[in-house]
Design a protein with these regions (language model features):
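Extended, charge-rich, solvent-exposed interface segments
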Residues: 98-168, 245
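N-terminal intrinsically disordered, cationic/polar leader segments
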Residues: 308, 325-326, 330-360
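OB-fold single-stranded nucleic acid-binding module
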Residues: 40-52, 63-120
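OB-fold nucleic-acid-binding modules
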Residues: 2-38
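Active-site flanking loop/helix segments enriched in acidic
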Residues: 163-184, 227-234
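Divalent metal-dependent catalytic cores for phosphoryl transfer on phosphate-bearing substrates
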Residues: 173, 197-329
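Short, acidic/hydrophobic/Gly-rich beta-strand patch recurrent on exposed beta strands
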Residues: 54-59, 224
Length: 360
């Protein structure tokens, strides 16, 4: 194959994330470049038994399926690309009725080492967003008054912060992306802080620590590798699930905290340290709300109830905002149902802006 067939076209195209392409393509075709990693490569055949390739490519924001037909100039080149390869894909992206979002008149090349590093760390904008979210978590942990809950939270961030930063909030549905768990937890901490100012009887320190630890088991169940967007299946996560792992992690870090000299100075602090640990374990165990949804026990304290609904609220709103951006529109104001939401979505009412009243 000639190098010209593999070279990106000379036209000037902007670089986008897959989510940006998907959102813009809702209304018109989009010419642009995406940098992504090949998640899977499947060899398939048409009804006429002609071979074609089906590449699933992924970046920090989402995934896209690229079908490489036998007569495409890049068919042979794509056939040599392994799963895990990092590529630049340039073309016109359109939202079709048969295959959904797909590129037309496209070309492809491998990323160089610098581009590959940026792909996994994200653009400066996405890095700043992630750094702000993690800084919010650190600030909130530092403000926890109960020394036991603050210290066990600090131990978690110290030991598992790097893994935390690349974990997803879920394998699908909500915050299902590299770094999604940090964004989920940071947003939940803001909500929990606001809620405790309204319901003053809530134990603020316990609720904040519960938010931090509620999905800590997903550092194993939903962890991405250091370089990659393909989430592997973890044996421990599959065998026991993130709730059990999270509870075990709390116990492990609490045991580590007990060995520190400062722990002895807390022996007369009320409430007793063991009772604090039990309540934190309850929040982790009960945060799914009902046994049918995976919790071994249902919420039995105000903080456990609050955590369950804060978690559910953030997940549902994340799903909805994503659907408003990229969901299939049945009309200008109605978006097709996205599970697990109960039905079609309706475009939200715009916020009233003073001074924009009709002059008629």
């Amino acid at each position: 194959m000639s190098p010209a067939a593999l070279r990106l076209s000379s036209r000037m195209s902007s670089q986008f994330t897959i989510e940006q392409i998907r959102e813009a393509a809702q209304s018109a075709s989009v010419a642009g470049i995406i940098h992504a990693q090949i998640e899977t490569k499947l060899e398939r055949r048409t009804r006429e038994l002609k071979p074609f390739l089906e590449l699933t490519v992924r970046d920090l924001t989402g995934s896209l399926v690229v079908r490489v037909w036998q007569d495409h100039p890049c068919f042979a080149f794509c056939g040599e690309l392994p799963a895990g390869a990092c590529i630049a894909l340039e073309g016109e992206f359109v939202l079709g009725t048969t295959f959904g979002l797909e590129p037309k008149n496209w070309s492809i090349r491998s990323l160089n080492s610098e581009e590959r590093q940026v792909l996994f760390t994200g653009s400066p904008e996405s890095q700043e967003l992630q750094q702000r979210a993690y800084a919010e978590i650190e600030r909130t942990v530092a403000a926890i008054a109960d020394p036991r809950l603050r210290r066990v939270s600090e131990l978690f961030l110290d030991e598992f912060g790097e893994r935390f930063r690349r974990a997803a909030g879920a394998r699908s549905v909500h915050h299902a992306r590299r770094g999604g768990l940090v964004q989920h937890v940071a947003q939940m901490l803001k909500t929990a802080t606001a809620l405790t100012s309204v319901y003053s009887y809530l134990n603020r320190d316990l609720l904040l620590a519960g938010v931090l630890f509620h999905d800590a088991g997903k550092l194993w169940e939903n962890a991405f590798p250091k370089e990659g967007f393909q989430m592997p299946y973890d044996l421990l996560g599959e065998l026991v699930g993130h709730i059990t792992i999270g509870a075990e992690l709390v116990n492990r870090l609490w045991t580590k905290m007990r060995r520190e000299p400062i722990y002895e100075s807390w022996k007369n602090v009320k409430p007793e340290s063991e009772l604090v640990r039990w309540h934190l374990l309850h929040l982790v165990a009960a945060h799914h709300g009902e046994k049918q949804f995976g919790s071994p026990v249902e919420p039995k304290t105000p903080e456990a109830i609050a955590l369950h609904f804060i978690d559910n609220l953030d997940a549902k709103l994340e799903i909805m905002t994503g659907a408003y951006r990229t969901g299939h529109r049945l009309s200008a104001d109605i978006i097709e149902r996205v599970r697990p939401l109960p039905g079609h979505l309706v475009e939200p009412l715009p916020v009233y802006v003073q001074g924009e009243e009709s002059q008629s």
